[in-house]
């Protein structure tokens, strides 16, 4: 079952929380302080924006730290305004027990560069309640992330 706005506010730890980002059945995550494009880390907070060149991908850190209880998971989708500009997103589930900022991958499939501003809303996360708490909630490689984390695949 999807959590409505009032349950998101009550049951999910989101820091920093923005009333503007709270939606009827989700929360709009914002562009955080760091990005990774073409092999380089970018200080988005200092630059004020991140530019994704045409036909390139970017890793974007969320401004928000999300902490999920053991019976709630997250599902993310790119905001439709960005999709209409040719931006695609590939996101994994946010597992029950997750705690940290999220590193999200965007791909600019368009012929024009895409500019994302620091603290701009770019991805919506919806929260789903499991029928019971997970027996083995997430405690993996990326738990506790506060910065962009590159793949830990060996």
UniProtKB/Swiss-Prot annotation:
Binding site for dCTP: 79-84, 95, 124, 138
EC number(s) given by UniProt: 3.5.4.13
Enzyme class: hydrolase
UniProt cross-references to InterPro entries, sorted A to Z: dCTP_deaminase (IPR011962), dUTPase-like_sf (IPR036157), dUTPase_trimeric (IPR033704)
Key words, A-Z: Hydrolase, Nucleotide metabolism, Nucleotide-binding
SUPFAM superfamilies: dUTPase-like
Pfam families named in the record: DCD
Catalytic reaction equation(s): dCTP + H2O + H(+) = dUTP + NH4(+)
One Gene Ontology MF term: nucleotide binding
One GO term of the biological process aspect: dUTP biosynthetic process
Pathway(s): Pyrimidine metabolism; dUMP biosynthesis; dUMP from dCTP (dUTP route): step 1/2
Lineage top rank: taxon: Archaea
Family: Belongs to the dCTP deaminase family.
Subunit structure: Homotrimer.
NCBIfam families: dCTP_deam
PANTHER family referenced in this protein's UniProt entry, alphabetically: DCTP DEAMINASE
Function statement: Catalyzes the deamination of dCTP to dUTP.
Protein name: dCTP deaminase
Taxonomic lineage from the root: Archaea, Methanobacteriati, Methanobacteriota, Thermococci, Thermococcales
